[in-house]
């Protein structure tokens, strides 16, 4: 008996390879709502310890840059630019320092929409643009990032030929509906074909990081514990005497868990409760 709340993780709970959490699901507690933050504040570290959260920054877009080898996308990450501002600059044809919050918000929808196969209707629904404007922005996006368009078309073609897509480490997802005559089934399979290699590779990366970090903790006989995984984020309970060492370990092992053609970046926060990490 630990007098603590324990979740369960499933390795095969999702089609892309992401871990899923249940009983209770601690991966779905909102972070951007007031209620979600208040719930997170209930999760506290033990006496003499702190919580340390390490979050991969834009990992799925970095994986997309690696796969697509689009020069503009790769350059933005190599220069450590804010990727949504960089996309705004290209799409709106303005200097990056002239990008405003509305421009960045639309660029963010476009960037993540590409990964999930978002349609002009989906863009319009998330941005309050018209469908015609949504389509226009998608066309401009692919005009500025032609490598992404080429990569996505190639993924769908390869999936039709082989019947599956795979992550960077070769983990496959078979999609028999990719050649379905039914438009809805075929479109759904095409979106899955686009998303799985990206999200699945991101899942591979964080799982490798988890193994490497735990091995290091064991080797050093440290008392720090990995207590949560929330997709792109790892959360540890760390004795205050180990905080500096733990931050160094995470900063070393998470960005180096798998070699990509763009750098991986990790943001680290710490604090007493999960809702107030800085």
Language-model segments: what does each one mean?
Residues 1-278:
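Conserved catalytic core of nucleotide polymerization and phosphodiester-bond processing enzymes
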């Amino acid at each position: 008996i630990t007098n603590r709340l324990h979740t369960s993780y499933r390795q095969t709970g999702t089609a892309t390879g992401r871990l899923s959490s249940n009983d209770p699901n601690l991966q779905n507690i909102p972070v951007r709502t007031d209620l979600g933050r208040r719930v997170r504040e209930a999760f506290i570290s033990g006496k003499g310890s702190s919580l340390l959260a390490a979050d991969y920054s834009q990992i799925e877009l970095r994986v997309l840059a690696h796969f697509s080898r689009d020069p503009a996308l790769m350059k933005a990450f190599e220069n450590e630019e804010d990727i949504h501002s960089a996309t705004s600059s290209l799409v709106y044809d303005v200097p990056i320092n002239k990008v405003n919050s509305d421009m960045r918000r639309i660029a963010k929808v476009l960037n993540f929409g590409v990964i999930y196969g978002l349609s002009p209707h989906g863009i319009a629904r998330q941005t309050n643009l018209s469908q015609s404007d949504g389509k226009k922005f998608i066309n401009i996006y692919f005009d500025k990032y032609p490598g992404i368009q080429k990569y996505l078309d190639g993924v769908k073609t390869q999936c039709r030929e082989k019947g599956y897509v795979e992550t960077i480490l070769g983990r496959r997802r078979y999609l028999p509906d990719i050649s379905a005559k039914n438009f809805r089934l075929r479109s759904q399979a095409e979106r899955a074909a686009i998303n799985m290699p990206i999200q699945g590779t991101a899942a591979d990366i964080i799982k490798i990081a988890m193994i490497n970090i735990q091995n290091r903790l064991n080797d050093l006989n440290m008392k720090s514990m990995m207590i949560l995984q929330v997709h792109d984020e790892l959360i540890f309970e760390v004795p205050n005497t180990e905080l500096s060492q733990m931050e160094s370990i995470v900063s070393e092992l998470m960005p180096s868990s798998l070699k990509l053609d763009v750098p991986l970046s990790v943001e680290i926060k710490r604090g007493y409760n999960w809702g107030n990490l800085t």
